[in-house]
UniProtKB/Swiss-Prot annotation:
A zinc finger (C3H1-type) spans 145-172. This is Zinc finger CCCH domain-containing protein 59. The keyword Zinc-finger applies. GO terms for cellular component: nucleus. It comes from the Eukaryota. The keyword DNA-binding applies. WD repeats lie at residues 185-226, 261-301, 310-347, 350-387, 436-472. SMART domains: WD40, ZnF_C3H1. InterPro entries: G-protein_beta_WD-40_rep, WD40/YVTN_repeat-like_dom_sf, WD40_repeat_CS, WD40_repeat_dom_sf, WD40_rpt, WDR86-like, Znf_CCCH, Znf_CCCH_sf. GO terms for molecular function: DNA binding; zinc ion binding. The gene is ZFWD3. Keywords: DNA-binding, Metal-binding, Repeat, WD repeat, Zinc, Zinc-finger.
Length: 472
C-alpha cells in the first residue's frame, strides 16, 4: 500500500504484539437469532496485555490521570478509558488529483481491493516529503475571522479558489493532526472500534449488522462477519474482544481463539467496560450486568450480579476512575458505583438530556449530553460530586476522549452533531482546533503511537495521526 498504509506498519505494529496465527472470530459463525431492531448505543474500552481471563482478576482498575506524574496516566492502571456485505469498490471512487487545491478524498482501503499508490499533493496528506501535520487551508480568512467548515467543492476535488477560499481545505485544523487512512466497508453507524493486545488486527462493528476485521499490516479488511443482529457495542480488554448484542454478550480471545457466550443478558447491550477483574454491560432496560473473571479455561467469565438501583432507561456509557464506576443513561442521570461493594454511592442529576459520554481526568469527571453541555465535576468537602464548570455548545455532544499532544499537554476531543469534533485544552476548556467528518462521529478510540480512530453514523472509519501524541 506504499506510504499510505505506513500508519499500520510504523505505529500499530511497533506498539502491538504480533499475534500467533490463529483462526479469527470463529465464534461469530454463530447460530444466533435476535429481534431485528433496537435503539443505538455506544461505548468502547482499551486493552491491556493478558494471557488468560484470570489475569484480569489480579490487575488494578482504571484510574484518572494524575498531575503528580511527569507524563501520562497511572502506570499501574490502564487509564485509557476517556471515557450487508455490500461494499463500495474504491476503483470507482478514486481521488482526483488537483495540485492547486487538493483533494478531500484520502486513500480508501476497502474489503479486498487495493488502491494504486499515486503521488499525493493535497491538504490531507501533503506531498510525499511533508509530515502528516499539514493543515494547509486551515488559516484565517482574508477578513481575519477563522474558517469554521469544510469546503464542499474541495470535498469533490474541484474548488478553484485555492487558498483564497473562505472554507477549509482540510479534514483537520489542529497542529500535528492529520487523517492518514479511510477504511471503507460499513454502511451504518459504527458502534465500536477495538485494537486488542496480542493481535495485529483492528476490529470494528456497525449498526448494519457486520463485524469487520482489518489487517494492521496491509490495511485490508480480511474478514466480514454477518452478525444477523444489530450490534450495540464493542470493546477489547487484554487479549479479549467483547461484543454486545441483543440478549447476548460474546467474548473472543485473540491469542487462543477461545470464544465464550456470556449468560444472563436480557435486552440490547449498549455499553461495556472492564475493571477490577469484572466485566460490566449496560442494557436497554437500564440494568448493569456484572461478570467475574475466573481461572477456569472452560468457563473464564462467571455471571456475578445485576447492580441494584440501576437506571430507569438505556445505559449509554461507562468510565472507571480509581475505585469508582460511573454510568450514564438516557434517563439524564450519572450513577456513581463503588467497585468494591458494587453499591450505588450517589446519583448526579445536572443534565437535562441523555448523557452520551463520560471521561475521567485528574481527580475530576467530565460528562457530555444531548442537551449540548459538557460538565466538569469535582469532589466537594463532603465527598459529593458537584459541577464546577459547564461549557455550553450550540449542538448536542455525542462522545468524548482524551490524549496528550506533542507537548505532553492533555487535550480532549468532543464530537458534535454536525460532524465536527472540537479539540480542547484541559483544564481550561479552551478550544484549540477541530477535525471534521461528513456525519456525526459516534465513536472515538485512542490507539498506540498517537493514533486516533473515529467512526461516524454513515459508516466511515478513519485513522488519524497526532504527531508525538500519547494516550491520556
Amino acid at each position: 500500500m506504499g506510504h499510505q498504509s505506513s500508519w499500520m506498519k510504523q505505529t500499530v505494529i511497533d506498539s502491538v504484539v504480533q499475534s500467533s496465527k490463529v483462526g479469527v472470530f470463529s465464534m461469530f459463525s454463530m447460530d444466533y437469532k435476535a429481534p431485528r431492531k433496537y435503539s443505538h448505543g455506544r461505548n468502547f474500552g482499551v486493552a491491556r496485555q493478558q494471557d488468560f481471563a484470570a489475569d484480569i482478576v489480579t490487575r488494578r482498575p482504571y484510574a484518572p490521570y494524575d498531575n503528580g506524574m511527569k507524563k501520562g496516566p497511572n502506570k499501574l492502571s490502564r487509564n485509557l478509558v476517556w471515557t450487508s456485505k455490500e461494499y463500495k469498490s474504491p476503483e470507482g471512487n478514486r481521488p482526483r488529483q488537483n495540485a492547486a487545491n487538493g483533494s478531500a478524498k484520502p486513500q480508501v482501503i476497502g474489503t479486498g481491493h487495493r488502491v494504486s499508490n499515486q503521488p499525493r499533493k493535497n491538504a490531507v496528506y501533503g506531498p510525499r516529503s511533508s509530515s502528516l501535520s499539514d493543515t494547509r487551508g486551515c488559516g484565517p480568512r482574508l477578513n481575519g475571522s477563522p474558517k469554521k467548515s469544510v469546503c464542499n467543492f474541495w470535498k469533490d476535488g474541484n474548488c478553484k479558489k485555492g487558498e483564497k477560499c473562505q472554507f477549509l481545505h482540510s479534514w483537520s485544523c489542529f497542529p500535528g493532526l492529520a487523517m492518514v487512512a479511510a477504511l471503507e466497508g460499513h454502511k451504518n453507524d459504527i458502534k465500536g472500534i477495538a485494537l486488542p493486545q496480542g493481535s495485529d488486527k483492528l476490529f470494528s462493528v456497525s449498526g448494519d449488522g457486520t463485524l469487520l476485521i482489518w489487517d494492521c499490516n496491509s490495511g485490508q479488511c480480511v474478514r466480514s462477519i454477518n452478525l444477523q443482529a444489530e450490534a450495540g457495542s464493542l470493546i477489547s480488554e487484554g487479549p479479549w474482544v467483547f461484543l454486545g448484542l441483543p440478549n447476548a454478550v460474546k467474548a473472543f480471545n485473540v491469542q487462543n481463539s477461545k470464544d465464550v457466550h456470556l449468560e444472563g443478558v436480557v435486552g440490547q447491550v449498549h455499553a461495556m467496560t472492564a475493571a477490577n477483574g469484572m466485566l460490566f454491560a449496560g442494557t436497554s432496560s437500564g440494568s448493569i450486568l456484572v461478570w467475574k473473571a475466573t481461572d477456569s479455561e472452560s468457563d473464564p467469565f462467571k455471571y456475578l450480579t445485576s447492580l441494584e438501583g440501576h437506571h430507569s432507561g438505556e445505559v449509554t456509557c461507562f468510565v472507571v476512575g480509581g475505585e469508582v464506576l460511573y454510568s450514564g443513561s438516557v434517563d439524564k442521570t450519572i450513577k456513581v458505583w463503588d467497585l468494591n461493594t458494587l453499591q450505588c454511592r450517589m446519583t448526579l442529576k445536572q443534565h437535562i438530556g441523555t448523557v452520551t459520554s463520560l471521561l475521567c481526568w485528574d481527580k475530576c469527571l467530565i460528562s457530555s449530553s444531548l442537551d449540548g453541555t459538557i460538565k466538569l465535576w469535582a469532589c466537594s468537602e463532603n465527598e459529593s460530586l458537584k459541577v464546577v464548570q459547564t461549557r455550553k455548545q450550540e449542538l448536542s455532544v455525542h462522545t468524548l476522549c482524551g490524549m496528550h499532544d506533542a507537548e505532553a499537554k492533555p487535550i480532549m476531543f468532543c464530537s458534535y452533531q454536525n460532524g465536527a469534533v472540537g479539540i480542547f485544552d484541559l483544564p481550561s476548556f479552551e478550544e484549540r482546533g477541530k477535525m471534521f467528518s461528513t456525519q456525526t462521529i459516534c465513536t472515538l478510540t485512542i490507539g498506540p503511537g498517537g493514533l486516533l480512530f473515529s467512526g461516524d453514523k454513515s459508516g466511515n472509519l478513519r485513522v488519524w495521526s497526532l504527531a508525538s501524541g500519547t494516550k491520556v
